[in-house]
């Protein structure tokens, strides 16, 4: 991880930038309308759109894609259409503005907090398109919409600066899967095609990050109960279950939620090549009574604590 740490340190602002400075880069953003402290926002290195979001990307049949069986993909299924979004691509783009089942969605992945969320882009009668600000808050991706140039916290789906301050995007059900499991479940599914952008796809620029002692560019409190900050947790609303706990039992049924775990999926934030990352397994989350899939995410513990400070830690007995 030394190479990426050095590179990011060279670009990251040592102190939190203030709104007057940002106004030069963002002249159309209303910085007087905010719900967060500007001191919480740092530069992550690349500037506005330095990490380019994907717009209306191409897809290919799952049967035609040459991906490693155990590499991770984000899965979205809407109105009978299933699409997979390989982390090998989202690692370098973080946002894909697209449609699934006729629904305009933003498929998002924040490497530094391991948050993968899918949002409905429709809000107040318009369809929003999202880009990457290049800013981080509590090490979490800050997005912006191109229609109003408001800033959004990816972890919460909430507008935090500008005309959309306080607005909230609808989060849609998605999950992280191994490529082989996606193909088995959706043999007629589609997968995001390799973008026509010069990036080292398949590699992880944050080598060793998920075994680091501390998160990068994080200024908030550490998790309680001596939980390692980069431990993965399954977040369902304001509740968090430790992945380590789930791996020991492979299934947890608790508080109205059923969570399952199965081995066979690589960590995208371990080794330099994603397909060689250690096996962290894949999880699914359901309503314990109806069996319906639930909105959830698998995130780092520090990020859950930062963005859900009143959250419940489901530690078991």
Where are these regions (language model features)?
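N-terminal signal peptide c-region/cleavage motif recognized by signal peptidases
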Residues: 12-14
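Positively charged n-region of N-terminal signal peptides that target proteins for export
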Residues: 1-4
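Mid-to-C-terminal functional-domain signal that highlights helix-capping/loop sites
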Residues: 17-317
